[in-house]
Amino acid sequence: MDKPDLLAPRLLALGDAAWTVEFGREISSEVNARVMGLAERVALLRQDDPLFASVGDLVPTFRSLTLHFDPLLTDAEALGERLLALGQQAGSKLHEGRRWRLPVCFEGDFAPDLPRLAQAKGLGQDMVIERLLAAEFRVYMIGFLPGFPYMGGLPPELAMPRLASPRQRVPANSLAVAGEMCAVYPWESPGGWNLLGRTPVQLFDLKQAGQPAMLAAGDRVRWYPVSRDEYERLQQQIQGGALPRESFLQAEEQTCPA
């Protein structure tokens, strides 16, 4: 007897002007790859397929893609059937987004939860930092706050539950972990994740009119350590416009600032 496909897509109506295609019930790179594969296919179809002509925003999440359309210009039922068929064809090849190498400072009040996490895991603080620096994180989705990246790839031994009592104020650009996820708070806000460091890089910048959010689903992120002095120097350069975000793209021919 054939086993059921646990990643088989489901089609869900989100009001009368949006469809959601959902894959499985777990968060994994394979599931997210199907989501991103479907998003790429729909983005191409918007250019030359009349059925997709009124499609607007595409919203990928951990395990689903929501597609907004104009119900006055589109046969919603036909669009839904086509989406479901495309979802069934979506492969699990990982979406290759951009690769970033971003600075982070782990010193002092930038990392208030680092000592507690290290103690809970029976590791030295240096060992926790080493594991974070050795990992490559994958952006699954942007959510919670504008530009807030939910990233998989956290080493399992560093998994940590959210704080029992969330902080009323988390500083902008704080590197944080919760459960098996890693994230960066692009804005000052309340939050319950464990704060392990801070980056001088602005992950959301309204001056970047075309794409204010720096990271996107499918991107990869690696971290490199900087001192407090280096952090402040980089922050000044970034805020002054001397160090554009593209400087942190990882490429064979490009050396990131240090």
Predicted regions and their residues:
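Glycine-rich active-site loops that engage anionic ligands at enzyme catalytic sites
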Residues: D2-A258
